[in-house]
Amino acid sequence: TPLYSSAASDVYKRQTYMDKAMAIKTAMTLFEWDNETLAPREAGELTSKVIGVLSGEYFQAVTCDEMKKLLEKCRGDKSLTTAEAANVRELLEEREQICPIPQDEYQEFARLTARATSVWARAKKDQDFEAFAPTLEKVIGFQKKFAGYRAKDGKKLYDVMLDDYEKGFSMENLDRFFSVLKKQLVPFLKKVMEEGKMIEDSFLKGDYPEEKQEELGRFLAEYVGFDFDRGVMAVSAHPFTTNLHNKDVRITTHYTDCVDSSLFSVIHEAGHAIYELGIGDDLTLTPVGQGASMGMHESQSRFFENIIGRSRSFWVPIYDRVQAMFPEQLGKVNLDQFVEAVNKVTPGLIRTEADELSYSLHVLIRYEIEKMLIEEDLDVEKLPRLWADKYEEYLGVRPENPAEGVLQDIHWSQGSFGYFPSYALGSAFGAQLYYHMKEIMDFDSLLKDGRVDVIRDYLREHIHQYGKLKDSRQILKDVTGEDFNPEYYVRYLKEKYSRLYGLESKG
């Protein structure tokens, strides 16, 4: 008599293959984290070979015939739990993404992007776009080729890429979304700049010692709910979050002479991390044990950074502690002056340091350029000029060098084309969640009482714990009772900045 039934044996085999795939993916993630943080400068070339080998193992684990047979057997199996069925669905989708790509090209791309991030970091530091351009051209070439392998029924290449980050939001959907933002926010931004009151923020820039910035960052991360027993904070060229599983989530920040840059980077990345730390124990280290989508992920990071972190109520119980850390810099700056300063609208060059009102225009610029790169074969060499022209057109500023222009983001070096729109979508998702939560709890009073945990627990219960069991549209519908509606985002920005800039009485 066999020890296991045939069905039980299939479950065991499927679990074994899935565990192997997730273990390899986790190892690659760990190498990528190390590459961006602690690895020595010369490590990149050889480490990229290791990542290439691991990516080949991952490719085999997901695409092998045995895995295919097991997944096909499970497709439509009514005895599977919700989580099991979701993992089968996720692995089938992963196979659809990977199987059309030849394994040697898949591994070569993994090696390329592992090297590309180091090349980008050096080029940014040296303000030298030409040093990065050939590598970027290769990354774009691979991504277009891969999208071509995966495209079905004449689907456009950029739509294939967009689907990787936010399913169901094609160029057609995003063109409509950004059209609403452009129509409503460009004239409102102009009104704020021309008619709004003056806000002083010079005290945010100056001599803020790094060790004190780190102390403040660690305090704020913990205050909003980042668990240092299950996470670490490090320094990198570009702040990011890495998730290994719900007992190991890592964030980074960077330090400049503008204290609010690091401060809000930490709260933003803590928002990402809180999402991953909140994934259910039954889901972590499985294919669905991660955020529902990049848009939903950004909704959480930007919810913590902006809706919570830039509100006056958030600072009421803790501002005196911040002043005590920086008595010379902030001792004579009262709470209202501080809150106004960290919300000041200043159309600038750097996306990660943009105010909420102009932020979506930074994303729009990247979206338009990505469409041109992927759909119109834009020459990479023309990127710095095009970037500068668009910044001048939309925000009235022009970068003086590539580091504050086209080289400022890490995403393209990683091959993450189609990611940027999720930032603006995330802001819009977050605003819709905010208006719903205001109806069911006294949001501001909770923040004034230092009860960020109540808000965090609500998000964990209704969003975080589910991982990828639901997509972003379903989450919004289940939580708010409505389909996605970008008008909440426009309303949030207009209400907030009309109040902040004294425009309420001006119509």
Predicted feature descriptions by range:
Residues 68-114:
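A contiguous, low-structure linker/loop signature
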Residues 24-86:
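Charged, amphipathic alpha-helical segments characteristic of ABC-type P-loop ATPases involved
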Residues 13-16, 20-23, 46-56, 60, ...:
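Charged, amphipathic alpha-helical oligomerization/scaffolding segments
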Residues 290-330:
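Post-HExxH zinc-binding segment in Zn-dependent metallohydrolases
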